[in-house]
């Protein structure tokens, strides 16, 4: 048998060069797997990418009542990805994005990490953001509900901190395609705290995340939820789309069902994972930075997403040691009870964001 060539054939090399030529600068930096995922799942076609973007941009004239403050290619592209390249749906989301900001001006005044309300929420761990992505390349966000000190943080400021965090994260084109998952730990969340979740503020959150933000949410997972969190379903149901209800899962303390969807190696020990307990200040230090000063405006238009990566890589070297703020889990980390799902276990989807 003759020698086996490890070099690509002229035909395969030509195909590879052709595929590479089709890539636009808007896909630069994406891994080959992510580019293929965008093609298969989102209908992203590099041959007509710029035409798709322009078709959305051409629709802006139909909504003179909305101030479209940003319309560059990269910005519009994230809305197309969020709506699987259905141009009309992408434009509707783009319009709702700016309309939501027009209707809630106070929420977006001083919309940066050093705003006192946003800063307090970030420092208190709203949201938590894990450094590593899951097996599908999704970014994992955490909310430890019992850490909500209502004398310190308003629900609106927590929502602002979450939206600002998403604005920073969505700059990464990999996350525009792979998306996010959210885990909410309801351990020790009191009935008194739950009573503050009024229909109006829940509606505000749903409109901001479900209807007005270009993120793909692969799931919202409730852990250790009490009975009165189940009761919230009747409050939020009128605000939900039918499709949306498929993406939140109520796991209770059944971590087996959680681990079937998110592998333990990607989770901190609070959720039965193999990672160390989550440090509640990690994401706040990432956004604010060890060299933070008043000159830094971390807004969704001026924040340099590369600063996040730089800061993450230098946290240990540049940050002074800080005591780790822990979640208020009912049980100690690493000892959460694994229960087999019974016939009556409520794992029905409750709420989802698409």
Curated annotation (Swiss-Prot):
It is a peripheral membrane protein. GO terms for molecular function: phosphatidylinositol-3,5-bisphosphate binding. Residues 118-279 form the CRAL-TRIO domain. Residues 317-354 are annotated as: Disordered. It comes from the Eukaryota. Keywords: Cytoplasmic vesicle, Endosome, Golgi apparatus, Lipid-binding, Membrane. Residues 335-344 have a biased composition (Basic and acidic residues). GO terms for cellular component: clathrin-coated vesicle; early endosome membrane; endosome; trans-Golgi network. PROSITE patterns: CRAL_TRIO. One of its GO terms (biological process) is lysosome organization. SUPFAM superfamilies: CRAL/TRIO domain, CRAL/TRIO N-terminal domain. Forms a complex with clathrin heavy chain and gamma-adaptin. Binding to PtdIns(3,5)P2 is not required for localization. The CRAL-TRIO domain is required for targeting to the membrane and for binding PtdIns(3,5)P2. This is Clavesin-1. It comes from Mus musculus. The lineage of its organism: Eukaryota, Metazoa, Chordata, Craniata, Vertebrata.
